């Protein structure tokens, strides 16, 4: 029986945002191949019960509370890594002799104690954290948060450079991250994001509205939405639906002030899929250059046209499946153009996505690398 420790930066259920979607569907796909998963989760608060969806795909689940000491911001270690430190985790790892897969650099603070442990060490590199925090700093309006994010970006630069060489293999999400890791060390492997979609939806030629969906607590998504709202103010003939269950009062006011824009909550995954299936086109904009965003896969598998800017993906094959705008003027033109078009890309997407981006194929690749003997 092949066994694997997975150390997650959070409890991976429900799989409701980018990084956690990758973690959950990776576990699901590895479990489906017969890998025995020992899951370790850093959490704000230990849950009272473990969801059946997690129990069914894991052998064990362990929880560790993140440290709540604000003085850790003054540590030389990135704050996200400093708060994820646990002696109990080390003891649990030693009880079961199996390779360890760290989900993101924020889970790697304990690696300093594992050098001579005999465990094979692997990293799922979720983001270039240096660029991620730099992007957060640029998008953030609050001056205090802007400074904190900038400092964290600088911390990550040194931390990343020092740590990446310590792993047997670093599994990268995107071409950009793959090229960056190769600069530091020769242990990079490109494994695209796990997304949970299995087949491309067969949809008719027209949808009913344009859709913007995302977590509106992040500065990047808020900035993207405000730009999109301003765009649709100039396009009163088109309806925009904003789907999010985390909209601030300020965002709600901005939406309600524009007649052709409405806000709807994302209650469940099924609810989101229903919104995607009825959309004519999706607006995906980001100001952070951090590889392919997981919501791109959700829209390509489950909806019609997808209008993107350059930061949504660095994969030319995926870009070719979308309508691209380099700036908001070009995005506006793509909205107008797509509104008049019939959607007929089902077969093209099926051919590309189901062959080159299936979760099963990616899990098989990971298994071949980790369990090569």
Tell me what each language-model feature is.
Residues 273, 294-302, 315:
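Short alpha-helical segment that forms part of, or immediately flanks, the ligand-binding pocket
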Residues 84, 340-373:
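A charged, aromatic-enriched C-terminal amphipathic alpha-helix characteristic of glycosyltransferases
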Residues 68-76, 122-155:
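Acceptor-binding helix/loop patch of EC 2.4 sugar-transfer enzymes
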Residues 90-109, 120-122:
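Short N-terminal targeting/anchoring amphipathic segment
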Residues 150-200:
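Donor nucleotide-sugar binding/catalytic pocket of nucleotide-sugar-dependent glycosyltransferases
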Residues 193-254, 263-273, 277:
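Conserved catalytic-core segment of nucleotide-activated headgroup transferases in glycan assembly
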Residues 168, 276-291, 304-305:
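Acidic donor-binding loop of glycosyltransferase active sites
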Residues 1-59, 95, 233-235:
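N-terminal subdomain of nucleotide-sugar transferases
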């Amino acid at each position: 029986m092949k066994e694997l420790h997975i150390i997650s930066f959070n409890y991976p259920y429900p799989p409701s945002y980018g990084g956690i979607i990758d973690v959950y569907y990776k576990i699901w796909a590895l479990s489906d191949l017969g890998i025995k998963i020992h899951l370790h989760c850093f959490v704000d608060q230990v849950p009272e019960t473990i969801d059946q969806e997690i129990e069914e795909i894991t052998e064990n689940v362990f929880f560790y509370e993140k440290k709540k000491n604000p003085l850790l911001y003054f540590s030389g270690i990135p704050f996200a890594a400093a708060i994820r430190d646990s002696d109990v985790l080390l003891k649990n790892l030693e009880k079961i002799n199996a390779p360890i897969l760290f989900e993101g650099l924020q889970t790697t603070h304990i690696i300093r104690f594992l050098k001579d442990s005999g465990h094979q060490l692997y990293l799922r590199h979720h983001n270039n954290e240096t660029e991620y925090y730099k992007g957060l700093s640029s998008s953030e309006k609050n001056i205090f948060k802007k400074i904190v994010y900038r400092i964290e970006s600088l911390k990550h630069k040194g931390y990343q450079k020092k740590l990446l060489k310590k792993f047997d293999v670093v599994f990268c999400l995107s071409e950009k991250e793959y090229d960056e890791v190769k600069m530091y060390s020769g242990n990079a492997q490109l494994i695209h994001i796990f997304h949970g979609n299995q087949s491309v939806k067969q949809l008719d030629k027209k949808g009913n509205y344009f859709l913007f969906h995302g977590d509106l607590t992040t500065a990047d998504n808020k900035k993207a939405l405000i730009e999109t709202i301003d765009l649709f103010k100039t396009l009163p003939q088109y309806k925009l639906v904003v789907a999010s269950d985390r909209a601030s009062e300020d965002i709600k006011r901005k939406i309600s002030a524009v007649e052709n824009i409405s806000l709807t909550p994302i209650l469940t995954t099924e609810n989101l899929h229903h919104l995607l299936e009825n959309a004519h086109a999706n607006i995906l904009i980001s100001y952070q250059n951090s590889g392919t965003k997981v919501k791109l896969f959700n829209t390509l598998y489950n909806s019609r046209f997808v209008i993107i800017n350059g930061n949504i993906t660095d994969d030319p094959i995926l870009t070719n499946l979308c309508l691209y705008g380099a700036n908001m003027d070009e995005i506006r033109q793509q909205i107008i153009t797509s509104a008049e078009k019939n959607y007929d890309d089902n077969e093209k997407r099926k051919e590309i996505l189901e062959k080159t981006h299936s979760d099963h194929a990616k899990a098989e690749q990971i298994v071949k690398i980790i369990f090569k003997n």
